[in-house]
Amino acid sequence: MPELFEEITSNVKLLYSSTPIPAYEKYIGSYLCSGEKNAIIDPGPKTAIPGLVRVIKEVGLQPEQIDYVILTHIHIDHAGGTGTALNLLKNAQVVVHQRGVKHLIDPAALTKGSIDTLGELVSKYGEIEPVQADRIVTGEDGTTIDLGILKLQIVLTPGHAAHHLSVFEPAQGVLFSGDTAGIFHNGLLRLTTPPPFRLRETLESLDKITALNPKIICYGHLGGYGDAKNRINEFRKLLLRWYDYAQTRAKQGQSFTGVVDEFINKEPELNVYFATLDKDARKRDYSQLTNSVTGLMTANA
């Protein structure tokens, strides 16, 4: 039987919803924070919701015991299933950046933007269903989600997206970074810099989460790891190095995919990593890398 969840701390679990898309089974997941109340961070796309509910039950909770669904941002792979989830998590409120509120209520523009960026993958993620306005709570800097023994702090972290926020649990030093500090998947740190990418805002957000002095970082893709501040710093160095190279090649007229191929060939760890991938995983990661490189090449500092 496949692993359904992983304990990060005694109060935090990574839930594998097993999104039924080849190579995405453990690329997308959610975090469960439990005290007297319970919160899910990033429910994932619509096709992940049946698996998410199954794992919630597996850890000993009922769907009605989820009090909050917190969205680090509204991109379809993190939040596309929110409306679907709320039909099952009947007592939950949604916490989201103020810029994301209107897109939860009316997801038409979000759906179009997702199709424009991701193409056929959107149909595999599933329809983005609307969320009722009275179930939405706006997350601001300083907003605290009180779960009893756990107090989750909202920290606005634009850069990856204008509507991005992170979540910090100070008692254990756990940071839920969404896509602010990159992807750490299959042992490799990678960029998450889709267009329209904002370098200055991203660097400011990295400073902001570093100042929290986190001990554990929980990536949106995927898992919880110690030595959080060093990991954030490693992402900063990777980001600046790739940004400078991508900007230079953009001015020289190189194509997006041309720069992607250059990165794969010139970065030893990336080259070895891509050589190990099967067809589906390579398609997933090549697409993600192309999206990130496009953001770097078209960014304004």
Please provide the spans of the model-predicted regions:
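Conserved beta-strand hairpin/beta-sheet module of binuclear metal-dependent hydrolase folds
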Residues: 2-59, 167-177
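Core dinuclear metal-dependent hydrolase active-site scaffold
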Residues: 32-33, 142-169
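Active-site neighborhood of phospho(di)ester-bond hydrolases with catalytic His/Asp-centered motifs
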Residues: 41-44, 67-73, 95-97, 157-159, ...
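Active-site metal-binding motif and surrounding structural segment of the metallo-beta-lactamase
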Residues: 50-99
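Metallo-beta-lactamase
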Residues: 104-155, 203-210
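Metal-dependent phosphodiesterase/nuclease catalytic metal-binding core
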Residues: 165-220, 230, 297
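Divalent-metal (often Zn2+) His-rich catalytic cores of metallo-beta-lactamase-fold enzymes
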Residues: 203-254
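C-terminal regulatory/interaction regions
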Residues: 248-301
